Amino acid sequence: MSNQDNNTLKVGMVFISMIFFIFGFVTTFIITLSDPVREAFDLSYTQAFLVNSAFFITYALFSIPSGTVVKKFGYKSSIVFGLILIAGASFLFFPAIQIESYIFFLGAIFLLALGVVLLQTAANPYVTELGPPETSSGRLNLTQSLNSIATWIAPLVIVFLIIPAAVDIGEIAQAVQPNDLILPFMIIGAVVLVIGIAIKMIKLPEMSQEGLGNFSSTFKYKHTLLGAFAIFCYVGAEVGIGTAISSYIVQDGLGGGISRELAIKFVGLYWAGAMIGRLFGAISLSDVKSASKKHAMAAGVLVWAFIVGYVTLDFSVNMAFIFFGFAIANYLLMQLGTGKANKALAIFALVAAALAITSMLSTGRLALWTIVTIGLFNSIMFPNIFSLAVKGLDRSEVSLASGIINTLIVGGAIIPLIMGVVADLSNIQYSFIVPVVCYLYILFYALVGSKVKPTVEQAPTTTTGA
């Protein structure tokens, strides 16, 4: 490879890394936005949670069609088109907010989400082409790390661009107005459009398309179908909690008198927990043989966890230490399941369910911290469920199974809506029974549903967990 080609790939990797940051940021931004939107449009919980439904329903409708688009037009062109969709949708929020039409607002979210789905469909495999095959896993880890950082930052952006603007005009609980929502979307639209134009102008290789089998062959694997539903439950629970958490902890007694601004920062900490947990997971599954080196790397992540807690929560040392303590517990529990994907998944699902139940049955800071730190235990669920769901499948079947699994990300549309209905019928605290049920199903899948039962065409095989 010439130096010119090598430099082109490096520049391309920089821009594709931005793609992962963008769809991580946009997704979490929309999830966290439901509470300010509820105030701005004077909505019920059910109506406000439609924000997530409008976003995540696209996974059910367009995950598989997006694959067809990528196959026809190529990865680079599909990525550029996805960015244009996101930018265009972002600019549509201006008229939607000006006329105060919530239906128009939801339509803009739907279009924006369509761009995100297209990006996710194209970007993951495209990263593997931007360099030697032997370093592809490292490139994927880098892009996923940027995605996790974006999910931490997005709620903080809401605090700085939406909540402070509202504080100036009156009481926080009643302050958010529709016009306060415009600026973030205009910034997102402008930045994404510039990146899309830049990627269009860069010369990058197109990725070859391999033939796939048919979907019927994938449906014979019971553990794959049960795994797809586990993804439905995982995404639904994670998004549902992330959506409800700020409204939940500002209720009298639950958050111990926490302001709306700090409550949304706790949402950022919830998503940061997933980032910390994934770093621990990467260390546990790394090629490093020395236990002492792994523990040293984990210590570095713990320091990072303290810094994240300190910066996110208004530079509070006490709250940073609390988050630090939960991060230690997360790492220690992860060691119990190292090398066995189903065991680690079972432990984390059980802990997540226990934390949600504890939060439901308590008040004050205990209710706050037990719900926020569930993010730490959501961290490894997606990769572990995915690895268990595709175990025993051949290469073409894995691609098809991936399409089915991506479709079931629609759980992010349905579970939060169910939580909204429960919150309106009772209160938001009791709505967390819905994610509890989700985590219990994931526990079932880890212990029972993930076991591979050979088909007639398939002899028994032995595989190892992720």
Regions found by a protein language model. Give the residues of each.
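Extracytoplasmic
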Residues: 11-43, 123-124, 154, 241-249
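C-terminal ends and interior cores of transmembrane alpha-helices
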Residues: 84-99, 304-317, 331-337, 351-363
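Glycine-rich segments within core transmembrane alpha-helices of 12-TM secondary carriers
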Residues: 135-166, 402-415
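Intracellular juxtamembrane helix-capping segments at the cytosolic ends
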Residues: 118-132, 379-395
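Conserved MFS/SLC helix-loop-helix module at the cytosolic interface between two early adjacent transmembrane helices
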Residues: 61-103
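C-terminal membrane-cytosol helix-exit motif in multi-pass small-molecule transporters
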Residues: 154, 158-167, 183-209, 334, ...
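Central cavity-lining transmembrane alpha-helices of secondary-active solute carriers
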Residues: 50-68, 268-280, 414
